[in-house]
Design a protein with these regions (language model features):
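Short active-site oxyanion
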Residues: 10, 61, 81-86
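N-terminal accessory regions of nucleic-acid-interacting proteins
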Residues: 1-34, 38
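Short, glycine/acidic-enriched loop or turn micro-motifs at the edges of active sites
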Residues: 40, 68
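Catalytic-core regions built around general acid/base machinery
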Residues: 22-25, 73-83
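Metal-dependent phosphoesterase core characteristic of DEDDh/y 3'-5' exonuclease domains
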Residues: 55-58, 93-112
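A residue-level signal for conserved active-site and pocket-lining positions in enzyme catalytic cores
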Residues: 37, 53, 87, 111
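A short alpha/beta connector and helix-capping loop motif
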Residues: 44-60
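Short, well-ordered alpha-helical microsegments
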Residues: 19, 72, 94-96
Length: 112
């Protein structure tokens, strides 16, 4: 599948219901892979935490703000799905932060 040369703006996700809807849509579409990156404030805080999650499919980009989201379990469900490859770049710190902050396990990882 060729990637589009048109890049629509990323969709901002900041509620539990938006997150659940997005994860349900992604899981239902049965993608081969999703790309994930996290941003943390560990350089500027005594105990760092995930401040932003960037998630991309072949057709759309999403910015997930975990602070206002009361329940991140839908994201954990995606991470646990073994049939979907999760693409990270230098995944070590992302995986540490995801485990530390949300207690989620990530399966089927491709680390660039």
């Amino acid at each position: 599948m060729a990637l589009s040369k048109e890049f629509p703006p990323a969709t901002y996700i900041d509620t539990t219901s938006q997150l659940r809807t997005l994860m349900d849509e992604i899981l239902a579409s049965e993608p081969q892979s999703v790309a994930i990156d996290t941003e943390s404030n560990s350089m500027y805080a005594y105990r760092g935490q995930v401040c932003l999650i960037q998630l991309s499919t072949r057709t759309a980009d999403y910015i997930i703000d975990p602070f206002p989201i009361e329940n991140m379990q839908a994201f954990g469900d995606l991470l646990a799905e073994k049939r979907i490859e999760k693409i990270f770049h230098a995944a070590d710190y992302d995986l540490i932060c995801i485990k530390r902050d949300f207690d989620f396990e990530v399966h089927n990882i491709f680390d660039t």
